[in-house]
């Protein structure tokens, strides 16, 4: 995970990223690299490439920091280059995200390899081509791998890696540092893993519309109100394992396996994409979502993704588990100061307001002020020794009184810092005073918190254990 100076390096050199092709996926890569603290060079021949990338960046800056409980590294530097040669010169990772035409990609690789370092990773975002196809006629074939992400790249963590074992392992390490989930595909196959599954659902959806069984809205509703929610946190096979009951997966297959012989799907057939069918789909889609601009839909999507992934963090499950790991690394890189003297405030928390915390008034809901202050207390207590290990021994602190004063609005994307002072430490009693400030140093809220040390077995208050008592005594 990169620090404020972006930690992953080759030797002592900070990694540099290049992006060739700045469309939806390429722009997403640019945002992911920049917001994780790395410098990026971009080449794109489209006259509006700069505008489109900046629009993607605007969405990413608004949503990506809200995934985490700590601030992200200082944003890297973005440079638009007039040629491939200039963009890839000195790059450690080159992301190719140009149109899905094999001949164009191979021509691009020839120019890239003529100017990039020989040990650089050339990672194609292709959703369908195999590495062996991309590598044909390349001067250094193994240098080219597939790193297939999902839109929006700055939020969704999955990247499918296909190619040389040594290169993909190295790529996986870099992607993990970027907060992504690299999935190394065991053998190359057209469309890799995820897109083969998506293609099956897409084909069936086209038939349902073609045959007049369902509209675009009804198909989307079947996904987002049903199995889509299950898939988002358990995938397909884990979901079916539950369906098998106590007898497990084998029972599920025995029970539902015969259904595979029934005419439930048309997976090997595709309806002819006639003008009539295309117009039908487009018209239904316009009725469903035409009231929103694409930019509005992107922001709705991003807000929902942030909210869902943050919910998964609570149970440390799926994508939430990955985000919690990233938070631990970010926390280690921004270790808070701890008080030396009674009443002296120290910074206990730095974070960004996620869009999912904003209510109907357009600002952070009051319930989340308490959440931020609670996190600040946890950080301070952990620094004094009352951490998870201490809790596992059967001791902790309970809040028995808390007062918050709301002094200024906090909006989505605002960077907040909490400064905490211990104002009383007598036996089992602990009092804290918090101040929440925004990036301009304005005090947004204050909080007075009274805690009691508790024995978790008896559920009654008691004096702190010797290590904690000694740490508190040093503050007197």
Locations of the language-model features?
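NAD(P)+-binding Rossmann beta1-loop-alpha1 motif at the extreme N-terminus of oxidoreductases
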Residues: 2-63, 115
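NAD(P)-dependent Rossmann-like dehydrogenase/reductase catalytic/cofactor-binding core
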Residues: 2-7, 11, 36, 216-339
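Active-site-proximal catalytic alpha-helix in oxidoreductases
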Residues: 28, 153-162, 178, 187-213, ...
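Rossmann-like NAD(P)-binding element
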Residues: 45-48, 63-122, 129-130
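Rossmann-fold dinucleotide-binding core
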Residues: 121-195
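Hot-dog-fold acyl-thioester-processing enzymes
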Residues: 337-400, 456-476
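Hydrophobic beta-strand-centered segment that forms part of the acyl-chain substrate-binding groove
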Residues: 380-430, 444-446
